[in-house]
């Protein structure tokens, strides 16, 4: 049976998701919300969506599934708005936020007495590119699509979401919202801090050592690629997971101090072990491409 899907947020993630849904469910009607007229026009012209609006509340009552692919603060605000709308009985509401605890807690509170099935989600895919113009049907190919079930999630909710998103060709997995935030603080959020910090440090250093800009090559490029990511999104992510991220920063500072002391003392064995352990751990770790 054909369904009506409402994707709020037609940036890279939302627009790519629309393409993936269309691939396996061409009969589904996809509605799209975005404040930007340009993004709405691109999504319509490329057939990602069937109808578009800049009034979020207008399409919500029509949808069987609502997916919020928005910054975290806006996702939380829209969850609160949805709680006051006359939605379809048994509607599924999900999101694509990079942190989950605050979003899931808000949904559980707002929809506690509603016939809403909410499941948090985080597709672990992305790019330094942004906007509907950069949408790619293969963006989620073989990437982890993490579900963080709530007290409002039923077994059939997850089954329906997996079917809806089958065209993304992602790898679906479930994890507790708080554990999700702990894990992603280390392997996603903190690396962005490192990349941006290294970029800022190098730019400052290059003011007196001009050749630093010219000599930057492969290793520097690889380590700083994600420093091109959208600042607003990452500000929102860090502030929504601040305690866990501060723990990661403090832990890393202590590790930097250790290797700094080893270099200062000329401790060849400790320095060699530092690099060798990292090399072995990197080789043993399953790092998704």
What are these regions (language model features)?
Residues 80-133:
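Rossmann-like NAD(P)(H) cofactor-binding subdomain of soluble oxidoreductases
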Residues 139-224:
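Internal alpha-helical scaffold of NAD(P)-dependent oxidoreductase catalytic cores
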């Amino acid at each position: 049976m054909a369904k009506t899907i409402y994707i709020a947020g037609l940036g890279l993630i939302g627009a790519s998701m629309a393409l993936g849904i269309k691939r396996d469910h061409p009969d589904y009607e996809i509605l799209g919300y975005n404040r930007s007229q340009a993004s709405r026009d691109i999504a319509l012209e490329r057939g990602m969506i069937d109808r578009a609006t800049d009034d979020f509340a207008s399409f919500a009552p029509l949808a069987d599934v609502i997916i919020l692919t928005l910054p975290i603060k806006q996702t939380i605000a829209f969850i609160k708005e949805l709680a006051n709308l006359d939605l379809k009985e048994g509607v599924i509401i999900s999101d694509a936020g990079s942190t989950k605890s605050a979003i899931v807690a808000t949904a559980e509170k707002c929809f506690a007495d509603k016939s809403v099935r909410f499941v948090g989600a985080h597709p672990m895919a992305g790019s330094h590119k942004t906007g509907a113009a950069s949408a790619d049907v293969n963006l989620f190919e073989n990437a982890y699509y993490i579900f963080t079930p709530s007290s409002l999630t039923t077994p059939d909710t997850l089954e329906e979401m997996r079917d809806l998103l089958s065209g993304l060709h992602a790898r679906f997995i479930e994890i507790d919202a708080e554990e999700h935030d702990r894990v992603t603080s280390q392997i996603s959020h903190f690396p962005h801090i490192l990349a941006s910090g290294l970029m800022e440090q190098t730019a400052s250093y290059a003011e007196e050592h001009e050749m630093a800009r010219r000599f930057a090559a492969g290793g520097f490029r690889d380590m700083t690629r994600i420093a091109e990511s959208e600042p607003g999104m990452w500000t929102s992510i860090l502030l929504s997971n601040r305690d866990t991220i501060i723990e990661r920063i403090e832990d890393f500072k202590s590790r930097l101090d250790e290797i700094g002391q080893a270099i200062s003392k000329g401790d060849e064995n400790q320095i060699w072990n530092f690099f060798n352990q990292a090399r072995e751990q990197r080789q043993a770790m399953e790092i998704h491409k």
